[in-house]
A protein has these predicted regions:
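Cap/lid segment of the alpha/beta-hydrolase catalytic domain
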Residues: 239, 243-246, 251, 260-291, ...
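Alpha/beta-hydrolase active-site loop
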Residues: 280-319, 336, 346, 351-364, ...
Length: 522
């Protein structure tokens, strides 16, 4: 067994008032290393099925390779503090109070232990007491909530599949083998241009608050297009950059749709690194919700100026046909500029530690609750259609905010995302809040938050977060985005058959099923 740190935990007390029973950390370590069930752990093991016992052993063996600086910085953010506070109702200190501070200390110390690193067992070893108390009543409630959510999700996914089949039965029969395969690149060659615009406005950046800032933008333009191209502005996710999902920008451009991908410097990869280096006090500033949408509005302003003064740009872009697209936090941004109103009342109601489980979605949305009422409307009327993948919406918009969107809207959801933006809370239920008649919900089953991400960006994520066959998800996203923007920016009704369940059934793959619906009952 490993050497114990000073003041190491010796046992875990499971409390189910008035009954208590005990398991030593040594017994858990023997089980993790050798698979042997000994001592007090036997009373727990006999109640578990073989697959559950194997899962427990796998969790105990799991090691996360993150530096103690990164772990420490993350643990002091509002986002992570809310999550730890919730777990602290289950894992208590030796004084039977919320285990928040003890858990945070133990996780940081375990990460700093170069020999053993950040493992569940090592976190237990570094707990700052002789005893860890587990409140089984709270744990039971916790697992009931999680189980209920999973069952509700599965029931909802099945209901959506049935609704999709009902819709398919009413749709005209189309032989898609005779139509272009939208998963394949289009006929246009793609030109990439990078430009930097100086924006004279205040904004949080990785170096602090700036009174003006550079807005870096990559453009993906169809070459030698016989007509002006519609424009889609793509918003990247939190902690990423404008290169993420470049594949879909190139794909759209090959089909004659110009794409601009701005860099949101207050929530990009560089900002995230600055935070973990200690240069920023928190993982995001509340004003970033406003600044991201402003980036897109400023970009459209600059492009209008270019089109009016530069013959090259005038010959390329039709700024009467503008759409927005985004993934994750970028999807949240895209919905804001499309008309979703930030819902301060909903944020103040929902931003409590007891209103979420494992997801980071609500804590991230809760940063917006300190915005002022005059910062809640970010709509740009030049935007004619919005395509949002895995957006975070439940609290920041709610039914009142989502109901403000009046333009065509496509929402993409990964059904088995339990970590970043749960499908039921952030996509499926919000889809029912939309009042626009031109709305679509595309469901990737059993997809995750990363079901259409490029492999190089998700290689280090655990398999349950990556999900099955992201390559298939990327093909779905490519095809659906082309069809959606051709219909709703260019009025190409010959692309409309691609936006229904009949087409979804044609391209759907067993490892990652695709369902598309146009309506759902609330």
């Amino acid at each position: 067994l490993q050497t114990k740190p000073v003041s190491s935990v010796e046992r875990i007390t499971f409390s189910f008032a008035p009954i208590e029973f005990y398991v030593s950390v040594d017994e858990l370590e023997i089980f993790a290393k050798e698979g042997k069930v000994t001592g007090g752990f036997a009373s727990i093991a006999r109640r578990l099925k073989p697959n559950q016992l194997a899962a427990v052993r796998g969790i105990l063996q799991q090691r996360l390779d993150y530096s103690p600086v990164v772990i420490s910085r993350a643990s002091y953010t509002q986002l992570v503090e809310m999550i730890i506070q919730r777990f602290g109702t289950v894992i208590l200190s030796d004084r039977q109070s919320n285990g928040f501070y003890a858990m945070r200390s133990a996780v940081i110390l375990a990460a700093a232990d170069r020999k053993t690193g950040l493992t569940p067992l090592n976190v237990m070893r570094h707990f700052p007491s002789k005893d860890i108390r587990v409140n089984l009543n709270a744990l039971l409630q916790f697992t009931k909530e999680f189980s209920a959510q999973a069952k509700y999700r599965d029931a909802m996914v099945n209901a959506i599949a049935q609704q999709a089949e009902r819709e398919a039965a009413t749709q005209a029969s189309v032989d898609f083998s005779r139509l272009p395969d939208l998963r394949q690149p289009g006929p246009s060659k793609v030109i990439k241009k990078t430009m930097t615009f100086t924006i004279n406005a205040s904004r949080p950046t990785s170096l602090g608050l700036a009174t003006s800032y550079p807005l870096l933008v990559d453009f993906y333009l169809p070459e030698n297009s016989p007509q002006l191209a519609p424009l889609v502005v793509y918003s990247h996710g939190f902690g990423s950059n404008r290169f993420n999902n470049e594949y879909v920008a190139r794909h759209l451009a090959s089909h004659g749709i110009a794409v601009a991908t701005p860099e949101h410097i207050g929530s990009n990869l560089e900002y995230r690194r600055a935070f973990f280096s200690g240069l920023r006090r928190d993982v995001i500033e509340p004003s970033e919700f406003v600044s991201r949408a402003a980036d897109m509005t400023y970009l459209l302003n600059e492009l209008e100026r270019l089109v009016s003064t530069d013959p090259e740009w005038k010959a390329r872009l039709d700024l009467q046909r503008v759409g927005v697209m985004g993934a994750s936090f970028g999807g949240t941004t895209a919905l804001a500029i499309a008309g979703a109103k930030i819902n301060l009342a909903r944020l103040n109601q929902d931003c409590r530690p007891d209103t979420f489980l494992f997801s980071a979605s609500l804590p991230l949305q809760c940063y917006a609750k300190s915005l002022s009422p005059d910062q809640t409307v970010l709509r740009d009327p030049r935007v004619k259609a919005v395509f949002a993948s895995y957006p975070l919406t439940s609290a920041i918009y709610g039914p009142e905010g989502m109901g403000k969107i009046t333009i065509p809207t496509m929402i993409v959801s990964g059904t088995h995302d339990i970590v970043m933006s749960p499908a039921i809370d952030d996509q499926i239920r919000p889809f029912t809040w939309l009042k626009t008649p031109q709305k679509y919900l595309a469901l990737f089953v059993p997809g995750t938050h990363y079901s259409s991400s490029e492999d190089r960006y998700i290689a280090r994520l655990p398999e349950f977060m990556r999900g099955p066959s992201p390559a298939t998800g990327r093909e779905y996203l490519e095809a659906l985005s082309v069809a959606f923007f051709q219909v709703h920016l260019s009025d190409r009704q010959d692309y409309a058959p691609y936006l229904n369940q009949a087409y979804a059934k044609t391209i759907s793959q067993p490892e990652l099923k695709l369902d598309i619906v146009r309506s759902l009952k609330k």
